[in-house]
Amino acid sequence: MDPINKIINFLFPLLTLYALLVFYPTYQRLKSVVSICRNLFPENVAGKVVVITGAASGIGEALAYEYGKRGAYLALVDIRGDPLFHVAALAELYGSPEVMPLVADVSKLEDCERFIRATVLHFGRLDHLVTNAGVAPLYLFEDIDDLSKASPAMDINFWGSVYCTFYASPYLKKSRGRIVAIASGCGYIASPRLSFYCASKAALIAFYETLRTEFGSEIGITIVAPGVVDSELSRGKFMTKDGNLVVDKELRDVQVSVLPVESAERCAKAIMKSVCRGDRYLLEPSWIGCVILWKVFCSEVTESIARWLLMAGPTLPVTEAPTKKILDVANAFRSFFSLPHY
């Protein structure tokens, strides 16, 4: 096999270059035609049944309202009961014919089976599955004392989506429905203190890309990679190395700094349009794509910049990171001109 690999190593770059010069322009023209058609004839989700996990806040909440405005039946899932019922009531006011709130923990296999089956039993079908539930562990890998405390990142962010997809896929095949996987820009771009979060989102992207090859046209899959969106996460709610959820505004200032925080409403509108067009991917905001290109072609540069900006040094507190200092300067500047702070 080694000689064959040597031949492929020599020929494949040449064939790839030729294909890019000859095939790629035609491919892009065809994609443009398909894109125009999808924009002219988007999917109508009125009357369709949609399951949204992590629906009590953030992107999940905003998507519930967007689907509701378009007349979809909703099964909203979250582990937090009170805010979930509030979102369900608002989604009906926005126009959903019927909303079923379901309190469940997506990290538990039996809970996922229960709410998928409850949805199908109640509404008689399932058309869209939005896997949105997630947590953000935020700490340095070397600071971990008990590695088992890191498991919620994979249990919720990755396995929670896998469990839902496992039980929903037979019904989605019947309706030729769609999975909307809410991943993250961190699934493509590494960031200090987010090792488990980045890993879980990268796994999610790879999982759904593989399912595309298995499901073919039976189930559509839209993989969404948002940037920093206004949510509990962007406001400083993180999972500590002990597995507890806490609000840490100082750590939030270090990690988010002056990055533009997109409103959940704007992000949800972009996702909704992308889903109705049948897009395979959505980067929201689109400038994330430029960062990914920098990572592909200049990975050493992007990694060095991330380390320099977000790491304070071995003997310094985390609040001494350059990102925090940049934020302090920006807020001082905005105070001088009486502008709202970041």
Model-inferred region functions:
Residues L121, A136-S151, R193-F196:
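Conserved mid-core segment of classical short-chain dehydrogenase/reductases
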Residues R70-V87:
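Conserved glycine-rich Rossmann-like NAD(P)H-binding loop of the short-chain dehydrogenase/reductase
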Residues G81-D82, V103-F115, L147:
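The beta1-alpha1 cofactor-binding region of Rossmann-like NAD(H)/NADP(H)-dependent oxidoreductases
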Residues V49, A56-S57:
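Conserved glycine-rich cofactor-binding loop
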Residues S184:
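Residue(s) in the substrate-gating loop at a strand-loop-helix junction
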Residues T213-I288:
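SDR active-site lid
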Residues T165, S200:
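Active-site helix of classical SDR
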